Amino acid sequence: KGENASTPIVAQKTFEVVPAITALHIVSAPQLVYKYYEAAGVTNPANAEFATNTAGLKVQATYLDGKTRDITLDKLTISNVPMKAGKQEVTVTAKNGVKTTFHVNVEKGNATFVTPSPAILGAEDCSVAWWGAHLDEDIKVPAGETRAFSFTNLSSGALNYNNFVVVLRNAAKVEYAVVRADNYGWGNGYAACTLGCTGGVDWKTWLSGMNGAKVNVYVTNNNNGTADVVAIMQGTDGKVNTQYYYGINTVDANDFYVDFTVDCSCLKFDSAASARKHYTRAHRR
C-alpha cells in the first residue's frame, strides 16, 4: 500500500555453479531392436528415421573439475536412428556440444502389399466422424508375416487424432489394440508395447502436413503372441515422420486381422503402382 515495512525483507537463494562438461560416457545403452519392412511395389522414403527409445540409457558426464557423475537425459540431445539394416550409431550431445555415441541394431523384414476395400475409406471432405467407416473385410495377417498398406491420408486438421486409425483384432472383431496416427492407442495388448515417434517433437508442424500425407503402414504378426505396427508418413511439407508400436501382446497368432477406421479423416488406398509413384516423386524433390 505504499508503506514502508516495519522490518527489512530479506530473501536469498543458493545456486550451484556447475563446471563445464568435458566428456560424456555411456554407462548402459538401450537394447531395443528396431524393425522396418519393405514390400514389392512400395517405396519407403530414403531419409526415414526411428525415434530413439531411451529405456535403459544411462549417461555420465565428466566436468572441468575432474568429477564424474550421472546426468539426466533431459539435459542431452539424442539423435534418431537411421532406418537402415545393421548396426546404427546414435549420437548423444550435451548443451555445450560435447558428444558421445552408442549403437543399436536395426532389422529389415519383408512384407506383402495389400490394397483393401473400399479403396476410399470415409468421405473425402473428412466429414465421417470417429469409427464411422471401416474396411469391407478385415485383412488377415498370417503367423510370421507382415502386411503393407499405402494410402493418402486426408485430415480435417482440427486435432492430432483426426487421421488414420489402425485396428488389430480377431475374426470375431474382438480388439487386441487400436493405434492412432499420433502415436497413441489402447486395448488389452497395447499397454505392453514399446512405442515411439519422430513427429511428437513438434505436433503442430506434424499435423499441418497430414492433410494429403503419403503413408505406409506395416502390420506384423510375430507368431509369438505379439504384433508390431510401423507407420511412415511423408507430409505435404515434405517432412518424413515415423512411429512404431513393438510388442503389442495378447495376440492369437492364428486369429489376427487388421482393419482401418477414420476420425474426421479419409484414407485413399493405393495400388502397388500408385504407392511406388508417391515416394518416387518424393525422392526427386
Predicted regions and their residues:
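Serine/threonine-rich, repeat-prone extracellular segments and beta-strand-based repeat modules
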Residues: 1-9, 15, 67-96, 100-102
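Extracellular Ig-like/FN3 beta-sandwich strand-entry sites
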Residues: 54, 85-89, 212
